[in-house]
Amino acid sequence: MTMPYYASAEQIMRDRSELARKGIARGRSVVVLTFRDGVLFVAENPSTALHKVSELYDRLGFAAVGKYNEFENLRRAGIVHADMRGYSYDRRDVTGRSLANAYAQTLGTIFTEQPKPYEVEICVAEVGRVGSPKAPQLYRITYDGSIVDEQHFVVMGGTTEPIATAMRESYRADLDLEAAVGIAVNALRQGGAGEGEKRNVDVASLEVAVLDQSRPRRAFRRIAGTALEQLVPAEPAAASESAPEPKPDTETKPADTQD
């Protein structure tokens, strides 16, 4: 008689974590950061129809990486949750923390109870109302339901380590919009496959949006077209193109003298 297959709970959780992490790493990167006027979202996304960044509610934004169908289900569920809470109580009762907690519960339940975890990582961002001293909030929620209140910026998907390193080196709290877009795009260009290798990230492959704290009700707005082209820094010239060509040796040597 064959023995039944057995795997420890620890091994099952480890396998699920590995599956989710590999799925997330296959995606393109997203950078979310706070700047002087609110929160900026910059995502690598060549598609114009499928969005990785979107609005959740009046002062809330959403960014995600991983499997599109899975994080799209989460996005829509978050919108319904926010609408129901705002309708039942008050619009001010819909906060980033409440949405982040709801997402963490959902992802944690799926991770432990379903055969396959969601291969997603999401960020919920919130800005205060006009004139409020409340600082912007960033919440990172991972595939297993873990939730982290991040300071300053979040990097998700793809090769995150070189991008996060570039962000740590160049981030400042008082950035304006143009400077914030510049350091986010330059950080995404650091996510090459090899050490020191830079990737080509142009305007056509970017999805950019902001939560603008100065807007009176709905803070979310997208930036595209000419407005985005004016914000994105130009690609750095290759070293071979920028270096001056060596001049040919035109100096004449003195003629040999005979004794």
UniProtKB/Swiss-Prot annotation:
Pfam families attached to this UniProt entry: Proteasome
Residue ranges of the region described as Disordered: 231-259
Keyword Cytoplasm applies: yes
Predominant cellular place of this UniProt entry's protein: cytoplasm
Alphabetical list of Gene3D superfamilies matching this protein: Glutamine Phosphoribosylpyrophosphate, subunit 1, domain 1
InterPro entries tied to this protein: Ntn_hydrolases_N, Proteasome_alpha, Proteasome_alpha-type, Proteasome_asu_bac, Proteasome_sua/b
Subunit structure: The 20S proteasome core is composed of 14 alpha and 14 beta subunits that assemble into four stacked heptameric rings, resulting in a barrel-shaped structure. The two inner rings, each composed of seven catalytic beta subunits, are sandwiched by two outer rings, each composed of seven alpha subunits. All four combinations of alpha- and beta-subunits (beta2-alpha1, beta2-alpha2, beta1-alpha2 and beta1-alpha1) yield fully assembled and proteolytically active proteasomes. The catalytic chamber with the active sites is on the inside of the barrel.
Species: Rhodococcus erythropolis
Annotated pathway: Protein degradation; proteasomal Pup-dependent pathway
Source species, domain of life: Bacteria
Record function comment: Component of the proteasome core, a large protease complex with broad specificity involved in protein degradation. The R.erythropolis proteasomes are able to cleave oligopeptides after Tyr, Phe and Leu, very poorly after Arg but not after Glu. Thus, displays chymotrypsin-like activity, low trypsin-like activity but no caspase-like activity.
One example of a Gene Ontology biological process annotation: modification-dependent protein catabolic process
Post-translational modification: The N-terminus is blocked.
Name of the protein described by the UniProt record: Proteasome subunit alpha 1
Keywords linked to the UniProt accession: Cytoplasm, Proteasome
Localization per Swiss-Prot or TrEMBL: Cytoplasm
GO MF term (any one): endopeptidase activity
Regulation: The formation of the proteasomal ATPase ARC-20S proteasome complex, likely via the docking of the C-termini of ARC into the intersubunit pockets in the alpha-rings, may trigger opening of the gate for substrate entry. Interconversion between the open-gate and close-gate conformations leads to a dynamic regulation of the 20S proteasome proteolysis activity.
Protein's UniProt keywords contain Nucleotide-binding: no
